[in-house]
């Protein structure tokens, strides 16, 4: 047995919605991957930075993309920002990256996709969220009930 990072296999993390990990949380998926490695191989098996790297650069590598996965000139500008000034992060800011992974934020403060701001101050800027949620829940009910 060996830790995933030592296996030589390209590893990427991702979610495609609430049906895939019961929460649609990419950071939750990063945390889960880290914890599973630590359970199997000890507390030093993976750091928060390594787990986040699987979700960013690792995801790009798995997709054979060299234009995503990092913030650098010439790369697609996709990133999120979290406000660490909340009670959930109290006492954890000596390592903000680990705080982000272990404290599992419940919402994104800012999200930029392909250079376009889609979440600002925690609110979607691109859609009418109540309308989308109503439609989503209607479709979900129909799917479950067989309507």
Model-derived segments and spans:
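Residue-level recognition of short, well-ordered coil/turn positions
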Residues: 8-9, 116, 147
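Short, positively charged
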Residues: 48-50, 85-92, 145-147
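C-terminal cap of metal-dependent C-N hydrolases
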Residues: 76-133
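Short, solvent-exposed cationic patches
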Residues: 133-147
